[in-house]
Amino acid sequence: MLTIKPITKTRLLGYKRNYKHYPKTRLELIELIIERILSKGNCCDLNDIDVSAITDMTNLFNANNALRSFDGDISKWDVSNVETMYNMFTNSKFDGDISMWDVSNVTNMVDMFYGSSFNGDISKWDVSNVKTMKYMFTYSKFNGDISKWDVGNVTDMCGMFQSATFFNGDLSKWNVSNVHIMDDMFNGAIYFDNDLSGWNVDKVTNYDNMFNHSPLMTQLEKQPKFAHRNIV
């Protein structure tokens, strides 16, 4: 359970000045964010918080209602040392600019935008070290361009766009040759109708219900060429 220190008048006054903050742990960072939201509102600027020492951003904007309401500025955060962004924006209202984030060391993006309002530009993200994108955009409003993402190291895409009812991006050039799991990947993605027939799915072992309740369920010519068909 998350334990937050009492918010004192002295600590709140610190946020009214231009102090630089250097949290060393995820919990310290969460505490700082909550205090800032309570003192300056959910659209506040958090760029004066130096997050360069943080390696784990699990549940960062999902730990409580105040965090989920955040929609301020974190565009200049140095996230270059972060390794996991699990559940980072799950069910959050955040839709700010994070286009220039360096996510090159992140390996875990499970549930990152699950159920979130985010639809910003992340087209230039370097996701080449990510291993799992399981449920990354499930139930989200995301419909951005991620056509040039290097997903060559991803092994699990289970439910990645499940019930992502806004998404219809071009993924035709993705290198999914190391993916093993695609169960429910587009299940309920009611507008997704792009051509995936060129995907190399030789290593995929699980792909149950991959296109359930999506246009590709009946557009067989756009589906990847699985050795054993079981995609209903």
Report each predicted region and the residues it spans.
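Negatively charged
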Residues: 2-232
